A protein has these predicted regions:
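N-terminal secretory signal peptides that target proteins for export/translocation
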Residues: 1-10
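Secreted glycan hydrolases and related glycan-binding modules that recognize and/or cleave
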Residues: 6-7, 24, 28-247
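Bacterial N-terminal signal peptides
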Residues: 15-25
Length: 247
């Protein structure tokens, strides 16, 4: 039987619902934290981003060295005019890839770049490839990475960035193929300069990723750590993407 409320009772119920919603939002906001670089120890440093005080405490720096561009003929666009000597942190040399159609010249130049940084006295951890591989093509990406791994000296590790929807929509065979060839995946919860809404739901499914992984955070962005992260033996921490301060 339907029940009809009078205007006064309906107003009271409306106020109660509004209070409950406000309380819920307050709890959610209390749980979320703003990512502050000084609270972390691993960072991406892209070209054009000014060094920050937090880098002094860095244990690992993911440094953009170049971009592999070109739809018809791949070529490298260098992002660093010189090879600095970074004292202290481990350094990952990062290449942003628009294409994975690398010829031998491209791969040899990338590997030579790693050796040049190492010869300059830097503690090179390895090579990270930043490529937006689609969830339906991870096996093809893994095949490309296998070729890179075959040429990469054993003293260097191989890492990649990962998209959030890998955990939800990628086929298990593709994920397993990646797990065999790479040492780590850094899963980014942001796109461009914005945190992806609903990232918590994707991260809850990361248990399917049977490879060492980190979470890529955005400096100044929101972050709520799911309980499942700490329970995963494959979770290895965070990498913060640094931004220039807003003017």
């Amino acid at each position: 039987m339907a029940t009809q409320f009078g205007p006064r009772r309906s107003a009271i119920i409306g106020k109660l619902l509004a209070c409950c919603l406000a309380a819920f939002c307050a709890v959610a906001n209390a749980r979320a934290e703003i990512v502050k670089a000084e609270n972390y120890h691993a960072f991406w440093l892209w070209a054009g981003v000014e060094p920050q005080p937090a880098l002094q405490q860095a244990q690992e720096i993911y440094l953009l060295a170049g971009e592999v561009a070109g739809e018809t003929q791949a070529h490298i666009i260098s992002q660093r005019s010189a090879v600095p000597h970074l004292i202290g942190p481990k350094v990952w040399i990062v290449y942003r890839a628009q294409t994975i159609e690398w010829n031998d010249t491209i791969l040899n130049d990338v590997l030579a770049h790693l050796d040049a940084w190492s010869s300059a006295g830097n503690n090179i951890a390895g090579l990270q490839i930043d490529f937006d591989a689609g969830t339906k093509h991870l096996e093809n990406y893994a095949a490309f990475l296998s070729k890179v791994r075959a040429q990469l000296p054993s003293r260097y590790r191989l890492g990649v960035t990962g998209l959030l929807d890998w955990s939800a929509h990628a086929d298990p065979e593709g994920l397993q193929a990646l797990a065999v060839v790479v040492d780590e995946v850094v899963v980014q919860i942001y796109q461009g300069r914005h945190v992806i809404p609903g990232y918590e739901d994707y991260l809850a499914k990361l248990v399917a990723l049977k490879v060492n992984f980190r979470i890529g955070l955005l400096q100044g962005g929101d972050w709520v750590a799911p309980q499942s992260l700490e329970n995963s033996p494959f979770f290895k921490g965070y990498v913060v993407f640094l931004l220039n301060p807003k003017s």
